[in-house]
Amino acid sequence: MSDDEEYTSSEEEEVVEETREETKPPQTPAEGEGDPEFIKRQDQKRSDLDDQLKEYITEWRKQRSKEEDELKKLKEKQAKRKVTRAEEEQKMAQRKKEEEERRVREAEEKKQREIEEKRMRLEEAEKKRQAMLQAMKDKDKKGPNFTIAKKDAGVLGLSSAAMERNKTKEQLEEEKKISLSFRIKPLAIEGFGEAKLREKAQELWELIVKLETEKYDLEERQKRQDYDLKELKERQKQQLRHKALKKGLDPEALTGKYPPKIQVASKYERRVDTRSYDDKKKLFEGGWDEISKDSNEKIWNEKKEQYTGRQKSKLPKWFGERPGKKAGEPETPEGEEDAKADEDIVEDDEEVEEEVVEEEDEEAEEDEEEEEEEEEEEEEEEEEEEEEEEEEEEEEE
């Protein structure tokens, strides 16, 4: 509720009368108007309604006073908050102003310091320039206007370019200051009007543009020269590597800090065979045959050991007599394999001892084996024919 909403006692009485009129019961036919009990009940109802209305009005007044108190407190808090916010904003503005003043003061002090340092440097450079001019004036004016650079034995035989490269940072800075003192002229703008100042500013602007253009051109030229220098160095390194490889040296032998050693003998006359004369003589007298024989024997023994030490395949055992088994042959394929291995070993030993005899024996054995194989084939064919005849007879029966 707002503060403008106020009720007077007359308005409250009107509200009470209206509620009473509304709460009046409808008039019924005068059936029991003369009944005292009925009248008493009606009066009791009216008194109860009046009491309820009074209680409602008192409660409403209490609630309204409570709301007015809360609203008043809220307005007081709002007013206090506005005051504190205004004070805080004022303090913040004051703080910002002080910070800005301090920053401006520090910038002015820094600028003043830089100007003072620059002035001192210029004064020192001017003093040095005056001293140099005075020294030049003191020289003999009748002498030549050029100087001949002579090699000084006390400077380790360095040329002028080498001395220029070996200058320290302080020396270069000093020379830069002196050259700038000659090149930078003071501005004489006292008593100039606006038009002359504009002309002077335009002239200085054109000079700045010209100097920046020259600076950019020189930087680009330096970049190209650095690239060309790197390319030439790499090309020289590759040529030195090829040269070292042709001479039979290490590829990096000629690209190091120090030059390679001088070759005093031809690379084609180097001694590779360090054996003595007696050793070479023995080789030509038959020692080479012995060496080759020993090496062949060694190779043969290694192969023999490899063959005997191989892993043998184990076949499943055969129960019963093998088909095609002859008298004197082993019962199982494993025994036959072992027998064959023993025969091969014996044959190899015989071949090492007597090659010619072994060849003849092998041929005879091959012939015998072929004959045996032929006989076995014939027997198998006969057995097959007999089986076929038996099958035919059975079919006929």
UniProtKB/Swiss-Prot annotation:
It holds the Pfam family Troponin. One of its GO terms (molecular function) is calcium ion binding. Keywords: Muscle protein. Residues 37-77, 84-129, 136-148, 294-307, 319-329 have a biased composition (Basic and acidic residues). Isoform 3 is expressed in the hypoderm. Isoform 8 is expressed in the dorsal vessel. Isoform 6 is expressed in adult TDT muscle and isoform 9 in adult IFM, flight and jump muscles. Residues 1-16, 331-397 have a biased composition (Acidic residues). It comes from the Eukaryota. Some glutamate residues are polyglycylated by TTLL3B. This modification occurs exclusively on glutamate residues and results in polyglycine chains on the gamma-carboxyl group. GO terms for cellular component: striated muscle thin filament; troponin complex. GO terms for biological process: intracellular calcium ion homeostasis; mesoderm development; mitochondrion organization; muscle cell cellular homeostasis; muscle contraction; muscle organ morphogenesis; muscle thin filament assembly; myofibril assembly. Disruption phenotype: Flies exhibit 3 distinct syndromes of myofibrillar abnormalities; elimination of thin filaments except where they are bound by electron-dense material presumed to be Z-disk proteins, degeneration of muscles and reduction in the diameter of the myofibril lattice. The keyword Lipoprotein does not apply. Residues 1-148, 234-261, 294-397 are annotated as: Disordered. InterPro entries: TNNT (IPR027707), Troponin (IPR001978), Troponin_sf (IPR038077). Troponin T is the tropomyosin-binding subunit of troponin, the thin filament regulatory complex which confers calcium-sensitivity to striated muscle actomyosin ATPase activity. Belongs to the troponin T family. This is Troponin T, skeletal muscle. It comes from Drosophila melanogaster (Fruit fly).
